[in-house]
């Protein structure tokens, strides 16, 4: 099951050339970028691990691409994403986020249903990947 999080998530994986064009756009708008990775793909897992330091005031997309390549090399079976942060007063939030690396095998999720009082059903998602210990999931 393909993980769909962030911008471009329903499109085929971006090529390095396409990623570089997006990074050029991010830099041209004066946004800060950072690279994050995780092996816990749950949709509510918003706290991914930060790769290096955030890239403030970067003027060249190749610096961000270098960090992506380094992260991919060190964490080949992890999800890796790029976030673009706008520090403009009044916005001050992530304005773009997209996945640039994913594991070769994405096992998907188990939908757990639970009967509750008054014939109510409660649902929860469980990632098959998290059945293995952290660092050995893919």
UniProtKB/Swiss-Prot annotation:
Gene Ontology MF terms: ribulose-bisphosphate carboxylase activity
Gene Ontology terms: cellular component: chloroplast
Predominant place of localization: plastid
Matching Gene3D superfamilies: Ribulose bisphosphate carboxylase, small subunit
InterPro entries in the record: RuBisCO_ssu, RuBisCO_ssu_dom, RuBisCO_ssu_sf
Keyword list, A-Z: Calvin cycle, Carbon dioxide fixation, Chloroplast, Photorespiration, Photosynthesis, Plastid
Cysteine disulfide links: none
Miscellaneous section: In this alga, in contrast to plants, the small subunit is encoded in the chloroplast. The basic functional RuBisCO is composed of a large chain homodimer in a 'head-to-tail' conformation. In form I RuBisCO this homodimer is arranged in a barrel-like tetramer with the small subunits forming a tetrameric 'cap' on each end of the 'barrel'.
Family classification: Belongs to the RuBisCO small chain family.
UniProt-recorded name of the protein: Ribulose bisphosphate carboxylase small subunit
Gene name of the encoded protein: rbcS
């Amino acid at each position: 099951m393909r993980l769909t999080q962030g911008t471009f998530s329903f499109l085929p994986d971006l090529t390095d050339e396409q990623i570089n064009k997006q990074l050029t756009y991010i830099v041209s708008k004066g946004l800060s970028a950072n690279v994050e990775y995780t092996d816990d793909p749950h949709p509510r897992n918003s706290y991914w691990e930060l790769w290096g330091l955030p890239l403030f005031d970067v003027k060249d997309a190749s610096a961000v691409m270098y960090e992506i390549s380094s992260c991919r090399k060190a964490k080949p079976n992890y999800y890796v994403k790029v976030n673009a942060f706008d520090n403009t007063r009044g916005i001050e939030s992530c304005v773009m986020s997209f996945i640039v690396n994913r594991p070769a095998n994405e096992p998907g999720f188990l939908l757990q249903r639970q009967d509750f009082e008054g014939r109510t059903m409660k649902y929860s998602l469980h990632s098959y990947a998290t059945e293995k210990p952290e660092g050995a999931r893919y």
